[in-house]
Design a protein with these regions (language model features):
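Metalloprotease/metallohydrolase-associated module, dominated by Zn2+-dependent proteases
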Residues: 1-35, 50-89
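Active-site recognition of the HExxH zinc-binding catalytic motif
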Residues: 38-47
Length: 89
């Protein structure tokens, strides 16, 4: 499944992020750091698990965010050299 990430200010929508049914995730461009990671995970989980209720999505996104943040994940390196498990980059 392909998910496209877009960034724009979402003040009018009163949301940090939006997941659209066509696989587009919109993230508020003002988010930084750990909150950015949490919302990115949250909106992607909505697309990957459309039957989950909001509380399940929140639980999963917060758990994943805490694990990744503790492991040192930060949005710094944009290199694409090593393929993922499915062979894609």
């Amino acid at each position: 499944m392909k998910i496209k990430i877009e960034y724009r200010k979402l003040g009018r929508e009163q949301a940090h992020g939006i997941a659209e049914s066509d696989g587009i995730v919109i993230i508020d461009s003002r988010l930084k750091g750990k909150k950015h990671l949490e919302i990115l995970l949250h909106e992607c989980l909505h697309i990957l698990n459309p039957m989950d209720d909001e509380n399940a999505i929140i639980d999963k996104s917060v758990t994943l965010c805490k694990i990744l943040w503790k492991e040192g994940y930060r949005r710094v390196d944009n290199s694409n050299d090593t393929p993922l498990q499915d062979g894609s980059k």
